[in-house]
Structures are given as C-alpha cells and as structure tokens.
Amino acid sequence: MAEISAKLVQELRQKTGAGMMDCKKALKETEGDVEQAIDWLRKKGIASAGKKSDRIAAEGLVDTYIQPGGKVGVLIEVNCQTDFVARNDAFKTLVKNLAQQAATADSVESLLAQPYIEDANLTVDEAIKQTIANLGENIQVRRFINFALTDKTGVVDSYIHTGGRVGVLVELNSQSEAGAANEEVQNLARNAAMQVAACPNVEYVSVEQIPAEVVQREKDVESGKEDIANKPENIREKIVQGRIEKRLKELTLVDQPYIRDQSISVEDLVKQVKAKAGEEVEIIRFVRYILGEGIEKQESNFAEEVAAQMGVK
C-alpha cells in the first residue's frame, strides 16, 4: 500500500486526539482512509467519539443578525489574520453589517455582489477590500447561513459565546403568532441556542433526526470493540444496544440536561413551555459555528513536527 504521509497522521491526530504511533498504525490498517481509521481507533478504545480538534487556528468573529420580529436570522463567520484586528471596531462594524446583509443572500458570492449597506456606491466585496487596505490584513467571509420563517409561525434566535468565537442559530416553531410572541417561547429559543453552544458534541435536535447511516456506523463501532468480543452473543447484543442508545443521546439536544436546571432535560423544558404557552412548540433545527473550525494558521509547522518524529523526510 501507499506510504502513510505525515499530513494524514496530522489530520487523524487533530480529529481524534490519539497518539502519533496509534494514528500511524490505524492508517496502515485502513489503507490511509481517515474515516475508517477513526472507527478503528474507537474500536480499540483509543479515540473518543466526541473528540474535537484542539488545533483550530483562525482569527475573526462569529456574529449573528436577528431581524426585528424574530422571523429571519443569520449566523456568519468572517476571518482575519490576528486577534488584534478581530477586536478592532472597524472590523466589528463590518461583520455586523455583513450579518445583516446576509439575510437576503443565498451564497457568499451573492453577498459580495450586493451594494454595501453603508455606501451603495460600493459592493460588499469593495467595502471588504477597503477595510483590508485600512487594517492591513486579509479579511474573508468564510461562511454564513440564514433561517427564514416564510410559511411557518415561530421564532428564530441566536446566541454568541466567548466574544464571538462560538455562535448558534436556532429555529423554533409554534402553532400561532400569539404563541411565537409568548415570552416563554421566545426565552426557549434563546436558551436552546445557549444550550447548543454549551454542548459541542450535540449535532441533532432529536434521535429521530439522526441519519440511518450514522446509527449504523455507531453500531459497527460498538460491535467491533474488543472488550465484548468474548461475551455470549445475546449479552453482546444487549451491551451494544445500550451503548448505541447512550451515544445517540449524547448527539441530541433534547436529551441533554438543561444547563440552567440540571434536574430536567431540554425535552422536559420544551414540555413546560408548551404547557405555559397553551400550544405545541418545537425546536426544529440549529446550526453552530466555531471560529476557525478546521482551519490551520499558515505558520503552523505541525506537519513538519510529525514528520520529524516519524523520521519522514
């Protein structure tokens, strides 16, 4: 098979937190397939399913815009090169304006082509270039998403954590406009966004939203773990099922202990709000952005560091 590169080992280490030699062995066993290598490490008990990269390295801001009335919301990430610029008022103003303009855009390209909100003689792209010239750093709109309640009643709300490093956008549906305007319902939308920010492993609202292929992957991983290999099949199946159920709940928002009251789950909180509002209320979807997630600083020498330790030229 092809030689395992230092870059592949680096990628696997970032995704799992496993040791270098374990990562190298996993990649050899799976012929360089990173996703299969992750599962191999998990089966060996070396990698945690919830491990996130600890080498996220990009500056900038994650910000949000909620249209008055709470029917349209935006989550946006804009990157720069240093924290110094990220804290600059001109950069912050630019990001705020871009978040508002992204409410009517369907792609980064279409956003860049819009007339700029503070000067219609400029496009957004030209306004960004002017800011680059003024601040002396590259600035890029990395991504954004917008939620719009066009044919539904409900609330869109958001939460920004740690000074613009983590942001969450949440959509919540109600049966009526009166329900959407209910203070308890509006608080639920904000608290749900805060909950998602506090639970980095949560990826879905409920178990029902988890794709079948994700469930099957978890089953394959749990079934292949060595600690149950010698147990009778019926016992093994029960252990696997229990572990899968636990793992799936770790991925879902409604199954989390509520951050403001650990004695209840988020699902319990939703039920309480339904009772107070007198109608059905449901958390529909959410998106979480973590600043710089998956981006490496240009000056990082981590791959070279790995190569040196592996003896790779």
From Swiss-Prot:
Superkingdom classification of source: Bacteria
GO molecular function: translation elongation factor activity
SUPFAM superfamilies given in the database record: Elongation factor Ts (EF-Ts), dimerisation domain, UBA-like
UniProt subcellular location: Cytoplasm
Record's keyword annotation contains Cytoplasm: yes
Gene3D superfamilies membership: 1.10.286.20, DNA helicase RuvA subunit, C-terminal domain, Elongation factor Ts, dimerisation domain
Annotated segments matching region Involved in Mg(2+) ion dislocation from EF-Tu: 82-85
A Pfam family matched in the record: EF_TS
Cross-referenced InterPro entries: EF-Ts_dimer_sf, Transl_elong_EFTs/EF1B, Transl_elong_EFTs/EF1B_dimer, Transl_elong_Ts_CS, UBA-like_sf
Keywords, in A-Z order: Cytoplasm, Elongation factor, Protein biosynthesis
SS bond list: none
Record carries keyword Cytoplasm: yes
Gene Ontology cellular-component terms listed: cytoplasm
Role description: Associates with the EF-Tu.GDP complex and induces the exchange of GDP to GTP. It remains bound to the aminoacyl-tRNA.EF-Tu.GTP complex up to the GTP hydrolysis stage on the ribosome.
Assigned protein family: Belongs to the EF-Ts family.
Protein name: Elongation factor Ts
Species, as recorded: Trichormus variabilis (strain ATCC 29413 / PCC 7937)
